[in-house]
C-alpha cells in the first residue's frame, strides 16, 4: 500500500480520462496523492490508503451517467457498504432439480423381474396432453409417412438387387465351403458379401433420402395451397392485448462471442419490442459464460452503453457466471433457478439472433391462446452475411428451408422439434421437467448433454405439453457461419451432441415422435460414414470383379455356369429415381417462388440461375462434408474431445494455409482414389468423378467461397438474393447499423483498461460479484493477488488470474490505486499503448460540454 506523492503530469493524465469540466479538473489538480484524490471524489477519508479507490467507484462511474443511473436506481451498496451496479433483478430462487437418467433398459427390466422398484422420482405436476383431433391426425400422417418411406425403399432395394452382377446366395454351397482353403472360400464368397453389404448400405441411405423427399413434398403442398387447419399461428387473432401476468424473459446465453454484434442484435430486438407498446411485458437478460477477461470487460461496457443509449436500465440485465457448469443448458438452469419464477414465458435467443417486436408479441399471444403448448418454435431466416459461401447457404435455407419446415410441421404437428433458440417456452413446466441431469457412466457419451434442445423438447412432450413449429411466423432471424470450415467446427459439436442424445432413445416415457427425432439426429451425421462405406464397398466390388477370376461354377456337379448379370434398364431407372428424390425438392421450391412472386429473389431467371449454381456448389461440397462428418463420428466413438468454442459470427475468409491444413488429406485421398479406379477400370471413373473431383478441388473451393468480394459481387448481380437483402426489415437494418457503430468504438484490451483506466476500473469494480466480508484469509489472498499482478505486469498474468481479479472489487480497486500511485511502468505503458492503437476510441480528454456551451 502506498500513499506516495503524485507528480502533476501523472495526476493530469489521470484526470484527463475522467469526464469532468475544466473547473472540476482544476479543483482536483492540487491533490498531493491519489489517496487524497479518491477521498475528495468520494467525499470520505480512510485509514487504509488503498480503500479510497474502492470508495470512489460510485463517483467515478456516475460522472457522465449520473442521471440515467439514479433514475433507474441502479447504484446500491452491498453488505460491506461497497458500491455495486444493479445489473440483475433481485433473486427469487426456484427449485430446479434434474431427474437422473435411467438409460439402461436391461437394468430396468432386471429390477422389474426381481421385484425391485426403481428409485422414486421427485413429485412433479404431471399432466396428460388433452385429447385433440390433431393428435389422431398426426399419428395417421406418420403411419402414412412410414409406409411411403418403406415402400419406396423396398422397391428401390429390389431394383438395386437386380443390378448386382451376382444374384443371391442360393448357389453357394456352404457344406462345400467347409472343405475348401481360406483363399478358395474368399474367392467364392467375397463378391456376394460385398454385394450384400452394399445393398444394406443402399437401403438405409435410400430410406433417409426418401424421408426428406416426402417431407419437402408435403411442405410444398402446404405452402402452395395455404390451407393448414392445424397451424399453430392460426390460434390467435394477432391483436388482442397481452395480459399483465404474461411476463416474458428474453434470455441470450453467450460465451466468448463477437461483442459488438451480440449487443447490436440485442438493441435492435429491444427497440423493436418497444415500438409495439408492450415493452413492459418483457425483460432482457444477457447470460454470459465468457471466460476471456478482455471479452468480459467488453461485455460489461457494451451492456452499459446499450442501456444508456436505448433506455434499457431496469429492462436489460447482464449476468456473468463464475462457475461454468453444463455449458448452455447449465446457463439456462441457473437463470431459471434465480429468476425463472418471476416470468410466465421465456424466449431463448442465440448470440446472433434478432427477432422483431411483432414476432415476439405474436408468440406470447399464441402461448396465451394455446394453454397446452409448452414450446413454440419459430423458423429463423438466415441473413446478414456477405461471403459467397454464406450467401449461397442463406439462399438455400431461405428458398428450400420453408418446404422442409412446413413438412416437418405437417408430419409432427404438436410433437415437433425445438432448435434451442428463437422459440418461446412456458416457464413453469420447463423448470419442473426440462432440467438436464448428466448422462451416467464414463467416456465420450457420458456427462453433460451437449445438444440440449432436442432433449428438452422430448421432456416437455413427455410431461404432457405440446411442442409446435410456427413455420409461417415472420420476424425471426439468425446468421450462418461465414465459411465452410467454421460450419464444420459447429458440425463437430452437433455431431457429438446428437450421438450422445441417442442414449436417451429407450428412456421410459419418451413419445415415439421424439424417439424418431433422436434417430434422425444421429442419421444426420451417421449417414456420412454410411455413404463413405457404400462408396468404398463399391470400389472394392469393382476391384474384385476386375482382379479376381469369376467363379462360374459354385457347386459340385453344377451343369450350367453362373453368369454375372447386368441390367442397364434397371440401373438407369434407379439412378433417375434417386436424382428425382434428391433434386425435386429444390425444383419445387423454385416453382413455389414463381407462383408466389420472384421479385424479391431477383426475378424468375435469376432465382432459377441461383438454384442451378447452388446445386452445383452443393454437389462440390457434399463429398467434403462426407469425409469431415465421417471423421467426426469416428472421433466421437474414439473419445476425442469436442471443443465448445463459439463459432465465427463475422464475415471471415479462409486463408490458403488453413485450407491446405484442413483439406490436404481429402485432396490426396481423392487423387489416389481416382488413380486406383483408373487402374482398375477407366470407364468406371465417370461414375466416381463427382466424388473424387470434389475432394481434389476442396482446397480452392473452400478458400474462394469464403471471399467477401465474390459474395458482394454476386449480390450486385442479384444472384443468391433473398427478400431480407432486397427489402431488409427494420430489425435487420438496425442490427447492421448498430454493429457498425459498436465496432467503431469497440473496447479492446479490456482487462488492462479495467485495471488502469479510471472509468473502466469503476465499472469493473461495480459489476464484480465476489463480495466477501472482511476476513483475514481473504485479505491475505487479495494482497497476494495484487502483489503478484504488480510484480509480473499484465503480460505475466494468465487468464485465470485475470478473472480472479475481475471478480474481486476490493483487489481490483487496490491494484488500480497502486498502479497509479506507485507509477508501475508496465501497466501504464500497456494502457497507453492500448489507447494509442485504438483509432476509434473516444477523443481525449473526455470533457463534457459546459452548461454555457450546451446547445439549446
From Swiss-Prot:
<dbReference type="GO" id="GO:0016758">
    <property type="term" value="F:hexosyltransferase activity"/>
</dbReference>
<feature type="transmembrane region" description="Helical">
    <location>
        <begin position="517"/>
        <end position="537"/>
    </location>
</feature>
<dbReference type="Pfam" id="PF00535">
    <property type="entry name" value="Glycos_transf_2"/>
</dbReference>
<keyword id="KW-0472">Membrane</keyword>
<comment type="pathway">
    <text>Glycan metabolism; osmoregulated periplasmic glucan (OPG) biosynthesis.</text>
</comment>
<feature type="transmembrane region" description="Helical">
    <location>
        <begin position="574"/>
        <end position="594"/>
    </location>
</feature>
<comment type="similarity">
    <text>Belongs to the glycosyltransferase 2 family. OpgH subfamily.</text>
</comment>
<feature type="transmembrane region" description="Helical">
    <location>
        <begin position="144"/>
        <end position="164"/>
    </location>
</feature>
<dbReference type="InterPro" id="IPR001173">
    <property type="entry name" value="Glyco_trans_2-like"/>
</dbReference>
<keyword id="KW-1003">Cell membrane</keyword>
<feature type="transmembrane region" description="Helical">
    <location>
        <begin position="608"/>
        <end position="628"/>
    </location>
</feature>
<feature type="transmembrane region" description="Helical">
    <location>
        <begin position="691"/>
        <end position="711"/>
    </location>
</feature>
<dbReference type="InterPro" id="IPR023725">
    <property type="entry name" value="Glucans_biosynth_gluTrFase_H"/>
</dbReference>
<feature type="transmembrane region" description="Helical">
    <location>
        <begin position="198"/>
        <end position="218"/>
    </location>
</feature>
<dbReference type="InterPro" id="IPR050321">
    <property type="entry name" value="Glycosyltr_2/OpgH_subfam"/>
</dbReference>
<dbReference type="GO" id="GO:0009250">
    <property type="term" value="P:glucan biosynthetic process"/>
</dbReference>
<comment type="function">
    <text>Involved in the biosynthesis of osmoregulated periplasmic glucans (OPGs).</text>
</comment>
<keyword id="KW-1133">Transmembrane helix</keyword>
<dbReference type="GO" id="GO:0005886">
    <property type="term" value="C:plasma membrane"/>
</dbReference>
<dbReference type="InterPro" id="IPR029044">
    <property type="entry name" value="Nucleotide-diphossugar_trans"/>
</dbReference>
<protein>
    <recommendedName>
        <fullName>Glucans biosynthesis glucosyltransferase H</fullName>
        <ecNumber>2.4.1.-</ecNumber>
    </recommendedName>
</protein>
<keyword id="KW-0997">Cell inner membrane</keyword>
<keyword id="KW-0808">Transferase</keyword>
<keyword id="KW-0812">Transmembrane</keyword>
<keyword id="KW-0328">Glycosyltransferase</keyword>
Amino acid at each position: 500500500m502506498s500513499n506516495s506523492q503524485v507528480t502533476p503530469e501523472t495526476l493530469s493524465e489521470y484526470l484527463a480520462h475522467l469526464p469532468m469540466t475544466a473547473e472540476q479538473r482544476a479543483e482536483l489538480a492540487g491533490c498531493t496523492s491519489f489517496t487524497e484524490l479518491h477521498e475528495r471524489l468520494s467525499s470520505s477519508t480512510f485509514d487504509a490508503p488503498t480503500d479510497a479507490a474502492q470508495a470512489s467507484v460510485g463517483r467515478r462511474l456516475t460522472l457522465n451517467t449520473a442521471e440515467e443511473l439514479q433514475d433507474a436506481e441502479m447504484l446500491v451498496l452491498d453488505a460491506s457498504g461497497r458500491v455495486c451496479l444493479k445489473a440483475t433483478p433481485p433473486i427469487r430462487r426456484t427449485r430446479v432439480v434434474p431427474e437422473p437418467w435411467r438409460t439402461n433398459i436391461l437394468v430396468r427390466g432386471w429390477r422389474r423381474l426381481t421385484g425391485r422398484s426403481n428409485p422414486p422420482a421427485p413429485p412433479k405436476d404431471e399432466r396428460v396432453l388433452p385429447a385433440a383431433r390433431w393428435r389422431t391426425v398426426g399419428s395417421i400422417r406418420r403411419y402414412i409417412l412410414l409406409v411411403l418411406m418403406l415402400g419406396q425403399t423396398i422397391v428401390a432395394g429390389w431394383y438395386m438387387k437386380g443390378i448386382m452382377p451376382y444374384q443371391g446366395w442360393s448357389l453357394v454351397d456352404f457344406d462345400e465351403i467347409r472343405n475348401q482353403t481360406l483363399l478358395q472360400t474368399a474367392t467364392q464368397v467375397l463378391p456376394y458379401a460385398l454385394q450384400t453389404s452394399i445393398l444394406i448400405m443402399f437401403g438405409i441411405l435410400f430410406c433417409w433420402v426418401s424421408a426428406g423427399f416426402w417431407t419437402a413434398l408435403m411442405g410444398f403442398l402446404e405452402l402452395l395451397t395455404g390451407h393448414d387447419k392445424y397451424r399453430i399461428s392460426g390460434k390467435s387473432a394477432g391483436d388482442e392485448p397481452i395480459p399483465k401476468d404474461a411476463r416474458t424473459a428474453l434470455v441470450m446465453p453467450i460465451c466468448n462471442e463477437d461483442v459488438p454484434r451480440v449487443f447490436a442484435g440485442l438493441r435492435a430486438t429491444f427497440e423493436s419490442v418497444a415500438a409495439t407498446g408492450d415493452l413492459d411485458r418483457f425483460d432482457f437478460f444477457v447470460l454470459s459464460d465468457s471466460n476471456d477477461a478482455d471479452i468480459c470487460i467488453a461485455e460489461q461496457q457494451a451492456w452499459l452503453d446499450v442501456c444508456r443509449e436505448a433506455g434499457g436500465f431496469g429492462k436489460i440485465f447482464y449476468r456473468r457466471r463464475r462457475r461454468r457448469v453444463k455449458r448452455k443448458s447449465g446457463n439456462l438452469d441457473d437463470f431459471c433457478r434465480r429468476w425463472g419464477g418471476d416470468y410466465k414465458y421465456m424466449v431463448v435467443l442465440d448470440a446472433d439472433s434478432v427477432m422483431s417486436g411483432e414476432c415476439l408479441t405474436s408468440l406470447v399471444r399464441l402461448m396465451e391462446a394455446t394453454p397446452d403448448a409448452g414450446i413454440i418454435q419459430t423458423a429463423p431466416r438466415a441473413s446478414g452475411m456477405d461471403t459467397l459461401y454464406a450467401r449461397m447457404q442463406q439462399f438455400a435455407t431461405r428458398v428450400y428451408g420453408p418446404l422442409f419446415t412446413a413438412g416437418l410441421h405437417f408430419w409432427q404437428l404438436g410433437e415437433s422439434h425445438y432448435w434451442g433458440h428463437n422459440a418461446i417456452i412456458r416457464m413453469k413446466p420447463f423448470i419442473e421437467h426440462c432440467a438436464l441431469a448428466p448422462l451416467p457412466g464414463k467416456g465420450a457419451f457420458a456427462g453433460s448433454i451437449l445438444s440440449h434442445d432436442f432433449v428438452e423438447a422430448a421432456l416437455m412432450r413427455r410431461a404432457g405439453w405440446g411442442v409446435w413449429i410456427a413455420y409461417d411466423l415472420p420476424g425471426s432471424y439468425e446468421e450462418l457461419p461465414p465459411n465452410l470450415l467454421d460450419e464444420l467446427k459447429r458440425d463437430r459439436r452437433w455431431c457429438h451432441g446428437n450421438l450422445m442424445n441417442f442414449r436417451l432413445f429407450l428412456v421410459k416415457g419418451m413419445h415415439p415422435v421424439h424417439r424418431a427425432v433422436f434417430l434422425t439426429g444421429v442419421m444426420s451425421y451417421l449417414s456420412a460414414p454410411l455413404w463413405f462405406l457404400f462408396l468404398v464397398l463399391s470400389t472394392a466390388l469393382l476391384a474384385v470383379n476386375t482382379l479376381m477370376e469369376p467363379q462360374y461354377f459354385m457347386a459340385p456337379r453344377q451343369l450350367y455356369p453362373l453368369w454375372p448379370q447386368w441390367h442397364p434398364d434397371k440401373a438407369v431407372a434407379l439412378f433417375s429415381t434417386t436424382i428425382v428424390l434428391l433434386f425435386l425438392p429444390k425444383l419445387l421450391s423454385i416453382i413455389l417462388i414463381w407462383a408466389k412472386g420472384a421479385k424479391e429473389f431477383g426475378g424468375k431467371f435469376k432465382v432459377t440461375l441461383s438454384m442451378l449454381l447452388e446445386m452445383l456448389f452443393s454437389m462440390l461440397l457434399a463429398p467434403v462434408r462426407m469425409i469431415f462428418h465421417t471423421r467426426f463420428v469416428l472421433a466421437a466413438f474414439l473419445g476425442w474431445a469436442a471443443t465448445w468454442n463459439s463459432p465465427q459470427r463475422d464475415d471471415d475468409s479462409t486463408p490458403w494455409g488453413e485450407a491446405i491444413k484442413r483439406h490436404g488429406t481429402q485432396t490426396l485421398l481423392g487423387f489416389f482414389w481416382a488413380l486406383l479406379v483408373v487402374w482398375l477400370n477407366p470407364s468406371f471413373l465417370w461414375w466416381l468423378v463427382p466424388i473424387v473431383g470434389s475432394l481434389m478441388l476442396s482446397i480452392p473451393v473452400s478458400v474462394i467461397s469464403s471471399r467477401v468480394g465474390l459474395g458482394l459481387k454476386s449480390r450486385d448481380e442479384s444472384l443468391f438474393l433473398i427478400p431480407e437483402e432486397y427489402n431488409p426489415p427494420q430489425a435487420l437494418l438496425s442490427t447492421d447499423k448498430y454493429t457498425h457503430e459498436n465496432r467503431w468504438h469497440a473496447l479492446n484490451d479490456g482487462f488492462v483498461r479495467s485495471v488502469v483506466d479510471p472509468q473502466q476500473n469503476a465499472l469493473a469494480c461495480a459489476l464484480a460479484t465476489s463480495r466477501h466480508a472482511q476476513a483475514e484469509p481473504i485479505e491475505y489472498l487479495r494482497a497476494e493477488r495484487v502483489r503478484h499482478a504488480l510484480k509480473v505486469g499484465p503480460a505475466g498474468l494468465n487468464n485465470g488470474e485475470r478473472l480472479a481479479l475481475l471478480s474481486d472489487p476490493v483487489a481490483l480497486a487496490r491494484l488500480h490505486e497502486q498502479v497509479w500511485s506507485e507509477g508501475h511502468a508496465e501497466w501504464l505503458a500497456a494502457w497507453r499503448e492500448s489507447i494509442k492503437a485504438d483509432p476509434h476510441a473516444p477523443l481525449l480528454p473526455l470533457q463534457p460540454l459546459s452548461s454555457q456551451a450546451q446547445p439549446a
